[in-house]
Amino acid sequence: MNNYWEKRTRANAQKAEKEAATYARRLNSTLHHAADEIDRYIADLLLDISSGGTPTRTQLWTAGKYLKLRDCIQQQCADVGQRQKDLLDELLPKLFDEILETNLADFKTADSFLPTRMIRQSLDTAWSGQNYSTRIWTNTNALAAKLEQDITDYIILGKSRA
């Protein structure tokens, strides 16, 4: 009997890892797309500026196109944050349905599964003093600030992200 539960636990852990890996791949694809979009915009900006001679740091900093670049970065960060939120919204209920609810079936009758209202309530419960949505936006804003600072540093110092 004990062997059955060990196999069951391992199978459920493998399901969770598979779902998490799928989520990670999809998020990684979104991040690469955003980075490529930003790189393309930076290349276009530098090409426009360099066609008039070698730009100085001051010229680059004060160029009106810098504002467009910053807007592009902010838009890409917002898009990445929204995509991450959408992927998590899709992943968490799926993991619950396939793993936790399956395990609960062994201990409860079929008509006593957690209702959708309780699942939603568990997602809305505060963790570390913040609810799910607030944590997503906190992480998104931190990512946006870091990305904006990195891009600015790359432009000023002439480095590439690779």
Where are these regions (language model features)?
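N-terminal leader/targeting and assembly helices and adjacent pre-domain segments
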Residues: 1-161
